[in-house]
Regions:
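Residue-level marker of beta-strand positions
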Residues: 19, 100-101, 115, 158, ...
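Generic structural detector for well-ordered beta-strands
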Residues: 2-4, 117, 125
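Glycine-rich beta-strand-centered segment in the early N-terminal region that forms part
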Residues: 6-22, 30-105
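A structural motif shared across PLP-dependent enzymes of the aminotransferase-like
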Residues: 106-120
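Glycine/charged-rich beta-loop-alpha catalytic/anionic-binding loops adjacent to active sites
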Residues: 67, 121-132
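Conserved SAM-binding loop and adjacent beta-strand
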Residues: 78, 118, 138-139
């Protein structure tokens, strides 16, 4: 489905995408969930089933039914990490200018699209010399770096990274660069 170009809003950046990261695990999971029927979705997300039951108890069956139908009919865009050119900048955004290359993050913002609106706090300027494809990994790099920081290990410590998907592989590279074994 073609979507209209989003409007520029205060506090954000309108970006013409030039590269978007395809995350095989996340995108496949979203597509897989979308292809399931109601029962399959309920089995896959028992936490949401509990929420629906709680909502039915407090707001009634009809209101809950309508809320569930609205939620299930929403289109969930794929993607959450891209790079592109700033083609519009909110008046209150001062560190990004039209024409700057930016890397963007955020489910629901930095999806697989030709143009996206992204809040400023989810955008960063791309350094000169960094290619588009590498810059599109900004979100995964940030997730990996956050995990390393949360582990709070001393330089040279021995660390174990469990799971070597995209984030795990980037985490290993960050740990090696930080002198971890």
């Amino acid at each position: 489905t073609d979507a209209p170009i989003p409007a520029l809003q205060p506090g954000g950046v309108l970006v013409r995408a030039t590269a978007s990261l395809i995350s095989a695990g996340t995108d496949r999971a979203v597509i897989g969930l979308a292809q399931k029927g109601y029962l399959g979705k309920a089995k896959a997300r028992p936490d949401l089933v509990r929420k629906v039951i709680g909502k039915a108890k407090t707001e009634g069956l009809w209101n809950t039914f309508q809320a569930v139908q609205n939620r299930l009919s929403e289109l969930l865009p794929l993607g959450y990490s891209l790079v592109g050119e700033a083609v519009g900048v909110g008046a209150d955004v001062h560190d990004i200018k039209v024409g700057d290359r930016v890397a963007c993050a955020g489910q629901g913002y930095a999806g697989h699209a030709e143009a996206v609106y992204v809040p400023k706090n989810l955008c960063v300027k791309v350094p000169n010399g960094l290619d588009e494809e590498s810059a599109a990994y900004v979100t995964l790099g940030a997730i990996a770096l956050h995990g390393v920081r949360q582990a709070d290990q001393q330089l040279g410590a021995t660390v174990l990274v469990v799971g070597l998907g995209l984030v795990g592989q980037i985490t290993v590279q960050i740990c090696r660069a930080a002198g971890h074994k």
